[in-house]
Amino acid sequence: MRGIMARKEMITIDKILDTAFAMTREEGFANVTARRVAAKAGCSTQPIFRVYKNMEELWDAVYERAAAYFLDYYSLYPRTGKTPFANLGMAYIAFAREERHLFELLFVSDNQDGKHKKKSMYEILNGDAGNVVYEINLAR
């Protein structure tokens, strides 16, 4: 009689990205390596390179997720006043306090290691929702 083989868990692109993003939040972007992501995800490095061409592609995905995370954070940040840019500034400061590693990645990192395609501060703050443009219109 043959033994029943246990079904292997599939390591998805979402699981890899979620793991790398969580590592960035907890430990900092510099600690996101293929071996460390694989260890945290409970797999070998093979699934990482099956879904990502190379680590640069994964790093870009983590960076994009961090930028989207900041935009979500800002959109949910309480609007306490009508002074233009005050809410944006307060959200920026609170994000730095609460998400130190993501803040460093987005706004402090000089990207000398070439780990990601860095956006300008304006691109991150403005986002698809036009946050900076919205604040400028409030000032008029």
Where do the PLM segments sit?
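N-terminal intrinsically disordered/low-complexity leader segments
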Residues: M1-I11
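Amphipathic alpha-helical packing segments from all-alpha helical-bundle domains
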Residues: D110-R140
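Helix-turn-helix
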Residues: K15, T19, M23-E57, A61
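Short hydrophobic clusters on alpha-helical segments that form packing/core surfaces
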Residues: I16-T24, A66, F70, Y92, ...
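Helical hydrophobic small-molecule/effector-binding pocket
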Residues: F85-S109, K115
